[in-house]
């Protein structure tokens, strides 16, 4: 009624608070008054046997997956597209170290950043290692981390001294196995080791020029990768010094191969074959009479 006045002494009371469901924070905690600090609250408790926000377990890195096929790149050579350096580590064999018996060489390949690229293994017979030593004919199979053969290197038997034009060494490079993509051919020179990097049509693409002395006592031994007219260096094959004890007791060597990142992957693969050929020609034990080979 308009103009109604409450009786004297009457004071209106506030309405009763609305009941808050169990598990929800109090309103005062969510909306603190002036001068009050907010009170941390907890969300509703999960039901027994369940977690509100399950946390993932530790992430375990799996094996590297296969490389994505690229147009214009031979199958299996995709790992060479984005790299400009390959580190080659030859595994030391205990039988070879302690008994002096020559075994099939095995290698591990990594990129300059440490990524595993694959494994390489020699295939040769005991008679060839016994009679021919470092000049033995052989086949090297390079497999990717998934154990798929992606590269095959074939070295025929060439008799005679490498300083004679009739005894020049050669390595054929196949990728995929069965398809020749290039050759490594030793170029005759009376004092300096030289090699020609040839394409599938045996046309020269690059040259590899080594030092006059390849002993490299205490230092790395470098073979320069040059243009086909030898006017400019574009890469390097380095046999890394492994220390006096290792060099004296084993012929397990470490190599570093450097090339331009935009170089054709086929040429990169042929340079890899040149690295293996250089290892056998200059840094492998020389064969001879006696027990210098063993079946592995």
Swiss-Prot record:
Motif SH3-binding 3: where in chain: 66-71
Main localization, broad class: mitochondrion
Region (Disordered): 1-58
Chain span(s) of sequence motif SH3-binding 1: 7-15
Motif (SH3-binding 2): 21-27
Membrane-topology annotation of the record: Single-pass type II membrane protein
pH dependence (UniProt free text): Optimum pH is 5.8. Activity decreases at higher pH values.
Reaction(s) the record says it catalyses: a cardiolipin(in) = a cardiolipin(out); a 1,2-diacyl-sn-glycero-3-phosphoethanolamine(in) = a 1,2-diacyl-sn-glycero-3-phosphoethanolamine(out); a 1,2-diacyl-sn-glycero-3-phosphocholine(in) = a 1,2-diacyl-sn-glycero-3-phosphocholine(out); a 1,2-diacyl-sn-glycero-3-phospho-L-serine(in) = a 1,2-diacyl-sn-glycero-3-phospho-L-serine(out)
Low complexity: compositionally biased ranges: 1-11
Highest taxon, organism lineage: Eukaryota
Regions of compositional bias (Pro residues) in chain numbering: 12-22, 35-47
Lipid attachment, kind S-palmitoyl cysteine: 159, 161, 163-164, 166
Free-text domain note: The Proline-rich domain is required for phospholipid scramblase activity.
Subunit (UniProt): Monomer. Forms homooligomers upon binding to Ca(2+), Pb(2+) and Hg(2+) ions. Interacts with PDCD6 in a calcium-dependent manner. Interacts with PRKCD; interaction is enhanced by UV irradiation.
Family: Belongs to the phospholipid scramblase family.
Protein name per Swiss-Prot or TrEMBL: Phospholipid scramblase 3
Organism: Rattus norvegicus
Protein's gene: Plscr3
